[in-house]
Amino acid sequence: MSQRFGGWNRVADHLLSLTDSRVIQLNDGQAASLRELAKRLPNNGVIIADEVGMGKTRIAAAVARAVIAAGGRVAILVPPGLGYQWSDELQTAGVNAPPILRSLWQYLQAWETKDKDAPWFMESALVVSHAFTNWRLGENTVPWRWALLPEIYARWRKQANGRWPRDYCSNKMLDDVWVRQAAESIVGAIYASPENHPTRKLIEELAESTPWPGALTAGEYGRNAQLRPWLERAVGLGLGVFDLVIVDEAHKSRGQDSGLNRLLTEVVLKSVNARCLTMTATPVELDATQWTQMLGRIRVDDASKTAATTAISNYAKSVARVRQCPSDEDVRKEFKESATAFKLALNDYLLRRDKRQDPAVINFQNASGEGYHAYRREQEILIDTAQLSSEWKRAVCAAEALSFVTRQSDRTVAKRLRLTLGNGHGIASLIDQLHRDDKEDQKQIEADHVSWIATQHSSKIELTADKRLLRAEWWQNVMIQPFVKNAGSALFDHPAILAAVEEIEAICLQGEKVLVFGRFTRPLRALVQLLNAREMLRCVDANLPWPQSKVHENEEWEAILSAHRQLRRQGELDRVLLDIALAEQYQALENQRRNIREKLISHIEEGFTLKQPGKRVRALFDVFKKAVEEDSEQVQGNEDHALAVVARAMHELVQAYTENSTPSDFAQAFVDLVAAASDRDEGDADGDGQLDEAEASGLWAELKIRLHEEYNRPEGGYARLMFGETKPATRRFLQLAFNRKHGHPKVLVAQSLVGREGLNLHKACRTVVLLHPEWNPGVVEQQIGRVDRIGSLWEEKLNQVIAGKQVNGDLPRIEIRPVVFRGTYDEKNWQVLHDRWDDLRAQLHGIVISPRIAEKYPDAEEMIAEINGAAPNFSPSGSV
């Protein structure tokens, strides 16, 4: 724990060297950011607020490298699902870090043997999950989960005065070997460190504040119990002291008691001159005062925060005024002054690159003659309520009535319904509340801070004489009528789902893929089932391959019946005949896969001769090949055999039933498959950066299980669902497959909380459908950012059009398609989202008066350009 950090001026020198040498691959914008960070980090922490998809992680990884080169240590705090991406970026930047730290068990495992020479505090860089401190501790918790605090206390006391605490040696609660060895290692390292070391001060405070034998009471470690903070600090001692703390997705978990906040304030121990580097595309989402929270995360002093808060508030007010009176010279002058003050207040702490500096967006602007923001097109998928069935008209009418009635009651159920709408749940979402799943949608419910809306006559509905509440209950009963008679299939006829299906299929027919976001699992699953059922019937009718041998479940059959009716296929659908047709075409598909199996090993080997794989991939391939060679042909043909599973994966990824696949395609697909199935350092038990035969064999056994789970699915994969229960490995497989232009899935349907961060889904898709639009523009920006990234399909298509000099037509754009019930609260929902989006753009995008607002002032083009030109600019290059 006695590392010698050379200081921030040395870090600055290393950063400048990286920008000049380009040892790490950097674009011009990233290099400009590093140059600015070299100026600012010696003085204070910094917020990197680059727009989604512009490469913030590469910048942060480069800073981590520079700090380590200067003798410092780095902690990187990331959402649980981003460990894979960070592992890649750190390796690209030449930074070695162990796998993301997720749990107490994993933390203690570092001390499973006494001779293990790499405790956490010896690592130069650590990646820690935001959820690391979400420990569920209470009276019945097993001792090893809380024993580190009393162990460290006891050992420090013994070290300091030569005596163990009373009855320590005979206490059976403190007999866990890992905990004992962890405490011994931590205390020994602290005792050997200088007197002024931060760990010395903290452990002495810990020894003063830890009660004995009170520290042996499990109940004292609960969420808000007395010893919980001290246990968190004890764990932090084992991580060591950090000179740089990087916080990814820093807009998340803003609450004081959130897991991320506890990590920052209790667990991560900072050196005296430590800096915080936060990363977020949306530092402010709904309220300009959220800047204050973000400044707090980079440890800005109170006086500077107060001054910044005042400037931010004044700017927000002046934006509102100048939008109302753009022709008023005094108002414009006041706006310019407040914009300058806003810029000065945040300039030392904020860097932001946005799409104005993106080469593809500049090309679009030059070719189209439109504003840079026009490369995105927002166009509603409108549902005409006049065309609905009488049952659905009544349901929509009831939902509208609820949105009105509940505004006028203060009772609990009314508040729930009102919050449902207030959190961005328009009419489509309000109806879908009926199909919320307590378990599968728990994270979404927690994120919304909205309780379950009762839809049955039960104790959840408060029986009261309140007439307004009774009216709300009556309207609620009307709203559920479409679902009462056909509970299993009603969602397949949901107007929002049908409208989305029509739009999605039209885009897929053009050879592109579609990303769909929604909130509730059951409607999303129904959308996936219906899309798959419709595509299955089309394939059967056209005698095309479909990766399914029979109809599997009654729910799937309900979707197929609905699809049969919607597609207006002739006659009554016979399940037996359909199963026969599926079996016949599936046999043809299996024959293709068998052909792949026969040549798979030789194809991959030939591909590897043309382009050598990394040692890790080669070691895993050798284990795979050996397992195949040791088994008979009969065993190899078994569906569970590794050869069969990998062949199925290759069939999907390479589209091997075409004649164009080459050995190089197979080899690259195997490399991609290994990358998706595992973390880069997974299986490397001895930490030497390579896989020996035993390590490779152990890892391959695990990868085979993951591959089997993904590629032995019984249903077709035209559309796939990603929700809270989707495993990390499956998410990576889905990302890999979705980013390939050919093959399934064509449609990825993602629950908002799961799919809006950490996934790059841009290589074959430029359209985002919002089944349940939000009211938080920051969330929508994150969703769109999955496809609006460097190297996207949109960029590729734009370059093709410009190169082909076809710019007379409509240029390709990023398409944003919210599903909206025309003439209902949904339209209000979308309008408010636009208003909030405009506020966000005024602070971060340089668009004070958006094209939507500018339509009100057709003769004020010059004044609007003047106003937008005066907007604050936090670009590292100083201009846009």
Region spans (language model):
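Short, electropositive, low-hydrophobicity segments enriched in small/polar residues
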Residues: 59, 762, 789
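Helicase motor interdomain insertion/brace
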Residues: 1-48, 54-740, 749, 754-759, ...
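Conserved acidic functional residues
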Residues: 50-51, 772
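Conserved SF2 helicase motif VI
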Residues: 776-805
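A short beta-strand element within the Helicase C-terminal
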Residues: 293, 759-773, 782, 815-818
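C-terminal substrate/ligand-recognition segments
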Residues: 746
